[in-house]
Amino acid sequence: MSMDSYKIGLGNLDTKTRRNAESNNVSFWNEEAKKLSWFKPWTETLVWNSPFAKWFIGGEINASYNTLDVHQANIAKKPAILWEGEDGTSRTITYADLYTDVCKFANVLKSLGIKKGDRVTIYLPMVPELPITMLACARIGAIHTVVFSGFSAASLRDRIDDSKSKVIVTADVGYRRGSSIDLKGIIDESISGLNFVEHVVVLKRAEGNLQLGPKDSLWHELMNGSSDKCEPEHLESTHPLFILYTSGTTGKPKGVLHGTGGYLTHLNSTFQWAFDIKDSDIFFCTADIGWVTGHSYVVYGPLLHGATEIMYEGVPDYPDISRIWDIIDRYGVTIFYTTPTALRM
């Protein structure tokens, strides 16, 4: 076997591919970007002004289009998300379902005054409405900023204040180790006095009455009256897709901004190389979407490739240490991406 045909465990990334990348990385990424669907081609691949890079100048693209619209003709009925809650409840969301819900919530955001460039903070547990909100933002050119649902009101407030988000999307509760977490109460505390926050959209999950304030609206009520038709915005390649904040362990959290075209190109290619994804695969990444691994390997990466992914709300050892392995067995997971800590349990 020649070295040029030898696979190193990274899918299609063979020696020849690596040599091409090393010899002229700008030309290499120029070719990789062509694997995505662009509304308008770019005129310049890279403008580098250290430490800032601008990729695919002049090109126009949309992340929601590349994860949803491109699949509707061929795999609309294929499961996109297989969701399981900690209590064992489950949902199956096809690519057609996801497309419809994303379009509807994109129109909800428009009705709340959100336009291209506005920021939307998402403080949701690991439920399908989280990627739906992310993709709805991407569809209309809003910039999503997801905050891990385990963060305190003070940590959440820092991030909302820095991003100046006009709309917050949250839930009344999340579930962890059999207990409910009052997410809405944390939101109310975090936005007290932040007058630039105009609306809070609340996904109601728990039984009983939910006390709503003047800025609050219920997810299901807004969705019921929303159109399922929403054309994707044609966005410049450098248009921000999302802001994700660092953990803040070494100082004030820093918002890291990811541009659309560069992020999608890199992720689309590296996801294929790392996982060698096939149409029949069931992909399961245990990362929380509140972190960049979750953005890339629970949301954008699998959906770019038309994969079926597992999404789990809960901890890996509840009600016992076999939980993750039970999920793998039940859904026939073929690719499993997790941490060494989880494997050592």
Stretches found by the model and what they are:
Residues 46, 67-94, 204-211:
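AMP-dependent adenylate-forming
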Residues 64, 81-135, 152-157, 214-224, ...:
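Conserved AMP-binding/adenylate-forming core of the ANL superfamily
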Residues 77-79, 201-202, 213-245, 252, ...:
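Conserved pre-ATP/AMP-binding loop-to-beta segment of ANL
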Residues 87-88, 167-237:
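ANL superfamily adenylate-forming
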Residues 124, 145-161, 173-175, 179-182, ...:
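ATP-dependent adenylate-forming carboxylate-activation enzymes
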Residues 125, 167-186, 207, 312-317, ...:
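Adenylate-forming
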Residues 264-282, 292-334:
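Conserved AMP-binding/adenylation subdomain of ANL enzymes
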